């Protein structure tokens, strides 16, 4: 069968199609015929830099498909079921602990860029028929990270205001979930065209951070000086000081990305002054995933898929993400 892997070296140009034997499920295992995958910033880092992973590696964390074979003792799913892979293959429920985070797909475990993928049966969840395979493939990392951020760790509801940075996958999911939960949303971007698309999705206010670099102060103005209840922080060092300006006293900054780089500049006085909570978020449990999918089905909420590439154009898809030219999610089809 076909697999897309970094065999001897990392780098987009070194992610190539190879052949591997057909997988055979053992006890408690299943094989999934992969139908779609989606890109995350983590995948770009893994392919280009390795991100601490060893070669050879099949990258990409998020995919969806149909169960094509089951091993002995499997009862959670059956052949033909539509399923999503789960990023953490060992976090099923309960609070996050080190062991729960020890087996992520797409590094160090082989990821979803394979025609047929063997996994533990506990490492997938069923997906509703109302979602296409491409839509479902966006959920395991980006969707679940946004859900855990504003529905679990820093829950929002009617009367609350959140600020989402940019228009990538997690931020757009956070916008959609926040509106469904009844909250107000301020969205930022450097692109007026993307901000108009964010408004079409329900954003109450938008700020172009390129033309208005003091967007933290602007968020204060938009909330009559109070500040926002939650900031969905994706930029890291480049944006954290502005997030601390924007957040209200006693509010929360949920840190889910490091697009601005990996430095240690944390603005301690501002954090103290705001009595703000800073929460690191990386994906979630299977139980949280299932809760998210149930709410999405009830709300008839569909993920925003911006571009779809055939899997043999995966290098082009990664280059699009690298250029920041997307709104929402980029997907691959098998």
Regions found by a protein language model. Name each.
Residues 21-37, 47-92, 106-110, 128-131:
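Glycine-rich beta-strand-centered segment in the early N-terminal region that forms part
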Residues 88-165, 200:
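NAD(P)H dinucleotide-binding glycine-rich loop of Rossmann-like/cofactor-binding domains
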Residues 100-102, 181, 192, 199, ...:
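Glycine-rich phosphate-binding loop and adjacent beta-alpha segment
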Residues 161-167, 179-239:
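Adenosine-nucleotide cofactor-binding segment
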Residues 171-172:
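N-terminal Rossmann-fold NAD(P) dinucleotide-binding loop
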Residues 225, 300-304, 315-334:
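C-terminal capping/lid region of NAD(P)-dependent oxidoreductase domains
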């Amino acid at each position: 069968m076909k697999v897309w892997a970094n065999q001897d070296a990392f780098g987009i140009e070194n992610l190539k199609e190879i052949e591997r034997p057909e997988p055979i499920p053992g006890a408690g295992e299943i094989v999934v015929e992969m139908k779609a995958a989606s890109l995350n910033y983590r995948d770009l880092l893994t392919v280009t830099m390795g991100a601490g992973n060893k070669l050879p590696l099949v990258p990409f964390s998020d995919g969806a498909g149909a169960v094509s074979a089951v091993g002995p003792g499997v009862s959670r799913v059956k052949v033909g079921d539509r399923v999503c892979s789960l990023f953490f293959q060992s976090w099923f429920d309960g609070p996050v602990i080190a062991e729960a985070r020890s087996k992520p797909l797409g590094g160090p475990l082989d990821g979803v860029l394979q025609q047929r993928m063997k996994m533990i049966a506990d490492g997938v969840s069923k997906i509703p028929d109302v979602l296409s395979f491409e839509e479902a493939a966006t959920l395991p990392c980006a969707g679940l990270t946004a859900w855990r951020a504003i529905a679990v760790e820093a829950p929002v509801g009617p009367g609350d205001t959140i600020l989402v940075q940019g228009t990538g996958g997690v931020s757009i999911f956070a916008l959609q979930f926040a509106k469904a939960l009844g909250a107000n949303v301020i969205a930022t971007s450097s692109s007026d065209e993307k901000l108009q698309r964010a408004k079409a999705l329900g954003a109450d206010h938008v700020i172009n951070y390129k033309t208005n670099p003091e967007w933290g102060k602007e968020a204060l103005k938009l909330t009559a000086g109070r500040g926002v209840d939650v900031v969905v922080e994706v930029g890291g060092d480049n944006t954290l000081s502005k997030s601390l300006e924007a957040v209200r006293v006693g509010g929360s900054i949920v840190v889910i990305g490091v697009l601005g780089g990996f430095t240690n500049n944390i603005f301690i006085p501002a954090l103290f002054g705001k009595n703000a909570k800073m929460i690191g978020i990386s994906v979630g449990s299977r139980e949280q995933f299932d809760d998210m999918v149930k709410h999405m089905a009830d709300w008839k909420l569909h993920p925003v898929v911006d571009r779809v590439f055939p899997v043999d154009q995966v290098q082009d898809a990664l280059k699009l993400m690298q250029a920041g030219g997307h709104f929402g999610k980029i997907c691959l089809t098998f």
